[in-house]
Structures are given as C-alpha cells and as structure tokens.
Amino acid sequence: MIQISDLTFSWPGQSTPTLKINNLHIKKGEQLFLHGPSGSGKSTLLGLLAGIHTAQHGTIEILNENLAALNDAKRDKFRADHIGTIFQNFNLLPYLSPIDNVLLGCNFSKRRQANLKAINITAEAQALKLLNELGIDEDTQHRSVNELSIGQQQRVAAARAFIGQPELIIADEPTSALDADNRDIFIKQLFEQAEQYQATILFVSHDAGLASLFDRKVSLKDINGASL
C-alpha cells in the first residue's frame, strides 16, 4: 500500500532536515498507529503522503504510484481518488448539513463515483449509510454541522473520508478533543468502517496510550534519522 524509501525533507531555509526516513512499509488493509510528540514531523509526513509537499530526496509510493513522478494536478487527483483524510480540526463546511459535507468526498473524484456505481449505490445513499453506522441519527443528518457536538462533527468527517471507498484513510490526531470513552468508541467505529470497505488506516497521534488498539505501532522517533 505505502512504501517510503530514502526520504529526506527540509523546509525552505532549514539547515537540517525535518524528516529522514530510510524505510517504512505499510501493508494493504493494515491499521497502523504512528506515534510522535508535537513538533516531531508527524503532520509534515502526512503532508508528503497526501502529496501536499514533495521531498527533496527519496520516494513515496502509494498503490505502486511514485508521488514524485506526478505533477501538482495529478497529485491532487490521486489524493481525491485514493485517500480519505480525517484531521484534528475536521475541515467541515459549517453552513452545510452532515450529508452535504460527506458528499464533498465524492464530488471531486470521478473514481470514487465510479466505485459507488460499481456496487449499485448512489453517493447520497452511501452518505446516509455511513452516517447511520457512525451514530449520526436522521434528525442530526439535516442540521448545520456547526450545531453538532465535537464528537458528532468528528464522525461526519470520518464518513466523508470513507465515502466512495478510497483505499487509504489518513487520520491526524482526530481524537484529541474527546474523552477516553468517546475516543475508544470512535476508533472502534473507524476500524469497523475500514474492515467493511477494505481500507488501510494510518492513524497519527501523540497519545501513546492508543497504540494497543492497532495492528502495529511505529514511533516516528525510531524511524526518523533527522531526530537522532
């Protein structure tokens, strides 16, 4: 699913690299927990995986596609087609309903639309299915998302990530605003959706206590030569 090899990334004007990763492999269908404290380069790595940044050296391959070989437009298309994201601030549009926010995950990807057509379901039907399975009831589905609790907004963001069956889900500190009970419930729901849609999960957090819930734990400190 993901292969990182001999990667080096530095921000402009920086004398030393932020990231220097010789090797990281993530298998298809794996649920990987990537741990690192604030400022360790976690978000930078996710930006590289999402094609938002490009490394000065080395390769990142996702689904056997070398991201560095793609131009900006093709990287944007690849991200829209194959990667669902759940970020700490959710990036929901406050004036839209949960359903309309979820549908945005499909609106910019013909591949995701084709994935749904192949299983004979409309985007709206899958949006409703995802929201129901993630605990957003029918009444809440039609309210503005700015009326929802943090936990509800988080589940809307998760539904948006999964719609159209992208192969990779990237979650960046999505549970930081939740208490322990709601955090564990959300992660369980995330795993259920990933299993149903055969998605790989890369979950990034500073909270090492979450590691036991995942198939595999990787510490960014252990693989990032720039931090040594």
Where are these regions (language model features)?
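Helix-to-loop junction immediately C-terminal to a conserved catalytic motif
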Residues: A50
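Hydrophobic anchor residue at the start of the ABC signature
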Residues: A158
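Conserved ABC ATPase "signature" region
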Residues: N66, A118-D139
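Catalytic Walker B motif of ABC-type/P-loop ATPase nucleotide-binding domains
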Residues: I169-D172
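Conserved ABC ATPase signature
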Residues: S144-L148, Q152
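Conserved ABC transporter NBD signature motif
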Residues: G58-N66
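Conserved catalytic motifs of ABC-family nucleotide-binding domains
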Residues: Q165
